[in-house]
Amino acid sequence: MQRVVISGTGLFTPSESVSNDELVVAFNAYVQNYNAVNAAAIADGSLTALAESSSEFIQKASGIKSRYVMNKSGVIDPARMFPHIAERPDAQIGIQAEIAVISAREALAQAGKTPADVDAIIVACSNMQRAYPAVAIEVQAALGCGGFAYDMNVACSSATFGLRNAADAIRSGSARCVLVISPEITSAHLEFRDRDC
């Protein structure tokens, strides 16, 4: 049986971060506006007023002091409270593929491999920014790899399923070197308008 190892890893970290203090300023402004707009419904009991937050509350509840995000301005805008990630045309590499290529290059360098060594790419994450083209195909083209490439979505277990599929491909002989990439944009998963989320 073919031996399977993880020979390299790569990481993409967004360039922007949001501190608890910054998030609280935006969140509390959102709460004040929500409560003002819904004052009548709150007064008659059909809606519950939202509670403001504090940096201390967030740190005590989660241990988090700061988080890296894609598009800080959207996250800390009280009228939005989520990132604005612009759509790109299909002919342009998608943001997830761009992230994936950065981490893939780092993993290949760490493993002492080149794109020519890769004969399979599995992009495994819980949300894809767009349905077409497949992120894995974009990565394959950007790196110049051969073989096969596909996306898989198994919700929160996507990365583990991707690793398993890669190991199975190597054990079966259908691949020798597989890139498994999980370019999650978690900034877009979070509900920054919910204090308890």
Task: Report each predicted region and the residues it spans.
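Acyl-thioester C-C bond-transforming condensing/cleaving domain
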Residues: 1, 15, 32, 46-49, ...
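Conserved "HGTGT" condensation-loop signature of ketosynthase/thiolase-family condensing enzymes
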Residues: 1-117, 143
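Conserved beta-strand elements of the Class I
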Residues: 5-7, 119-122, 176-179
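Proline- and acidic/polar-enriched loop/turn elements at helix boundaries
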Residues: 71, 120, 150-152
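Short acidic/histidine-centered micro-motifs embedded in hydrophobic/aromatic stretches
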Residues: 61, 124, 181
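Short, histidine-centered active-site or binding-site loop motifs used for metal coordination
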Residues: 10, 122, 184
